[in-house]
Amino acid sequence: MNSEPTTLLQGTLDMLILKSLVAGEMHGLGISRRIQQITGGTFVVKPGSLFPALHRMEEEGWISSLWGDSENNRRAKYYRLTKPGRNQLEAETKRWGRISWAIAQALET
């Protein structure tokens, strides 16, 4: 398999952010690192994609945020998963399960 980072498919960024936050609250860089970790380096999320998505997801009520100090004593915005966010993650996980099954079926024919 190619070890180069892959472009995210439409609709996957929200799901990966929500999945990352299941582990606990994180700042933006932590979320980006977590996505890279849980995808085995397949997806690398750049700030230009991450922060607009975080802002939009906060407006949707899927995540909440608060300011705090990072591990190197710099101000950072920390994000956490909300109950509606957990519900959204569950729905997206089911949806992507159906999509991946259908694609696998199509590729086997």
Regions found by a protein language model. Name each.
Residues 58-75, 80:
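Beta-hairpin "wing" of winged helix-turn-helix
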Residues 81-85:
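Accessory beta->alpha helical hairpin/"wing" motif in late/C-terminal subdomains of nucleic-acid enzymes
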Residues 1-2:
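Intrinsically disordered, low-complexity and often Lys/Arg-enriched segments
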Residues 19, 33, 55, 90, ...:
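A cross-family signal for key residues in well-ordered alpha-helices
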